[in-house]
Amino acid sequence: MKKIIIIGATSGIGRGLAEVYSQEDYLIGITGRRENLLEEVCARDKDKLFYQVCDITDTQATISSLETLTQKMGGMDILIICAGTGELNPELSYQSEEPTLLTNVIGFTNIADWGFRYFEQQKSGHLVTISSVGGTRGSGIAPAYNASKAYQINYMEGLRQKATKSPYSIYTTDIRPGFVDTAMAKGEGLFWVTPVDKAVKQIKKAISKKKKVAFISKRWRYVTILFRLLPSAIYCRM
């Protein structure tokens, strides 16, 4: 029975993945800050679901929690980093930006490094992260969020290079959603908003295929290509 740990599983994509995987032959460990919601998810099947309360901005406590959770489950084969945050911040208030940086950059890096080292010692494993198509270009209304997702995309490419050169069976998957119908989707006039259940289904499929990069939904790949091709002079006027 494969063992999966999902970071940030109290709501949205993380919770959806935990619920879907619990219907199959997996042991699932979940983390989050809100214990009542973790208990709610685990109530679905207490024999297959385990939880550990964890705030990923506390880097030392996070590693301790992950080690405890891994011991409870008897190992880990797949690590999925879903935890993330971001705010619209056209006023450039640092108080709004700091939680994004602590979660999406510091917390993410701490967990990704721990997971990769764990898989190196185990000589196998699969590291998955939920980044965003927002990491493709900068954003005047959410500068820290887009920059943090660009960091995650670049960091995962570095780990993918490291995994490719490794003698071990280590895989990495960078999931890049567009707009998904969760609390993270902010702003007016959002388009191509993907329902959570559809996003979860596509993410699960990408993980099973060990895809290096997957766009959710698939059409966002073409939007990303267009954004990359746009000259800065045009993009900055959008």
Q: Where are these predicted regions, by residue range?
A:
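Active-site helix of classical SDR
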Residues: 112, 148
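Short alpha-helical oligomerization interface
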Residues: 89-102
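Conserved NAD(P)H cofactor-binding loop of Rossmann-fold oxidoreductase domains
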Residues: 82-88
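Conserved glycine-rich cofactor-binding loop
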Residues: 10-11
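Conserved glycine-rich Rossmann-like NAD(P)H-binding loop of the short-chain dehydrogenase/reductase
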Residues: 24-40
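Residue(s) in the substrate-gating loop at a strand-loop-helix junction
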Residues: 132
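C-terminal helical subdomain
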Residues: 174, 186-224
